[in-house]
Amino acid sequence: MKKMLPESKVEAIRKEGFLNRAVEAYRFFYPTVSNVSNFKALNDLGITENHDFIIQLTTPDLNVLTQNSDTPYCLGTGNTENGPVVIELPQGAIVGVADDINFKFITNMGLTGDEQGKGAKYLYLPPNYDGDIPDGYIVRKPSSYRFLICLR
């Protein structure tokens, strides 16, 4: 017959499980919380989703996750809750990325994107979209409705 663990050992294992879950939740949600703060900051500056972009001039005293301190950035947000969104990128020496609300990579854009700097129309579809997809677009389907576009 097997013996039960002492209550103190059971409690220690339970506490360790709670701690592990808390660390896991923190690591999972940290990028999401960080990106939601980007959306809030852009909204506070008057940027309208699916419509406006802002040019951010960075300096060494600006403390921002993953940005270079001497590079100007063009930032905007998209939201596919009301249907597909098109981002038209002009030809040129542009390097960019789109990330979903959880800061998970969607696509590269510009020189590192599928169009390799030749310019293109990116079509962002809502999750679970099952409608027609027109020709002539680079199609992306983020896992969330909201996404961030960062160009430089």
Question: Which residues make up each language-model segment?
Answer:
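A compositional/structural signature for long, glycine/proline-rich flexible linkers
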Residues: 1-152
